[in-house]
């Protein structure tokens, strides 16, 4: 009778290969990740082909290193003394292997084949691991090569955890951290908790907090489990409006109704949300947001809707089950690159020209906006287009206005959403102002600025056509979250 091997402690509720959990699936990304571990020589497609191409009886002499000879045995029937039937019934794949190689690479396999309770079965069923992930695991154990792809990395992490292969697990986590963005952060949060990867969990929270609106509007948010939903809705540092949180909860409820085979009626949405609904801080919405959104959703009872309206308007406020305190969100930090500001006649003037500067940071941050100088001649309004680019590619831009009061203070202008900025890479920020008034400008600029735990470096930008550079000019501040 064939043996069956199930995980001892890890939940098998994994996303399938079509999950949206990881979306950075370009081949370039894969190569970059594998280079930090080893040099790949076999593609993922080739891994599904038996390696039974031993040319001659003296094949050992043509493969001089132990690593080459071992690699040749990967997925090879030659001398195989065990077979695995990997994957669920109907979608399984038979994989040949060699007990000794597996045992020296994994304590789980060591105990399985050579421990006190070793089984003598020649065919072992592993229904909870995807075949592609199992082949990646075996390839690493035979050759030290790791090649990860977006659609299999979570399943590979599961396999690496199950068979206690920490180097492969670490490579998977690194890949996930590299590909982490707002649209997959919520799904990866649920998986990082499942796999007990605290560093990945922390990175997910950084993205979800700073880019909360993007994360909550993503398709991936609707795929999370109820427990992860509740954890996110409790989050004090979500940096978004409560109306966005409420709508995200409704979107999740619609998806959950479909998963449970229910129609997305108001009653069913309320039922699948359960107590999670009371984690939304409805009273912290503006009256207009509540009246045009939650009050018309039909998810709240008539009594709840009535009481919330009274809470907004009545002196004697009713007791509500919803939290009353506004979320703290994130406090924006400001990197100021000038030591002083000044004003001289005929400077700083705007004629539709671009003020621009390049910067790099030593840790990942989220750029939320820019601080700009305003008029030196009293109150004035400026139209401004701000832009953030990396290697010539526009990552974010916004066309807006700001009013200055005649002081030398900086005035914040914001991108629509905070933008993730990676470490050790130069980015370009630009501002094109339109206004008749002369403005203040910065001087005694610094090439390096320490701002909290983040170090900024500045250099001149070739895009700057209005005089701004490292030593002086516009764009005195970068506004960011870290």
UniProtKB/Swiss-Prot annotation:
Q: Which Pfam family name is an example for this entry? A: BACK
Query: Is Nucleus included in the keywords of this UniProt record?
Result: yes
Q: Which UniProt keywords apply?
A: Cytoplasm, Developmental protein, Differentiation, Neurogenesis, Nucleus, Ubl conjugation pathway
Gene3D superfamilies linked to this entry: 1.25.40.420, PHR domain, Potassium Channel Kv1.1, Chain A
GO CC annotation, single: cytosol
Annotated compartments: Cytoplasm; Nucleus
> What range(s) does the BTB domain occupy?
80-150
Instruction: Give the matching CDD domains.
Output: BTB_POZ_BTBD6
| Tissue expression as described in the entry | In embryos, expressed in the cranial ganglia.
Superkingdom, natural source: Eukaryota
| Entry function | Adapter protein for the cul3 E3 ubiquitin-protein ligase complex. Promotes the export of zbtb16/plzf from the nucleus to the cytoplasm and targets zbtb16/plzf for ubiquitination and degradation. Up-regulates neurog1 expression and antagonizes zbtb16/plzf, to promote neurogenesis.
How does this chain assemble?
Interacts with cul3. Interacts (via BTB domain) with zbtb16/plzf.
The name of this protein is BTB/POZ domain-containing protein 6-B
The protein's gene is named btbd6b
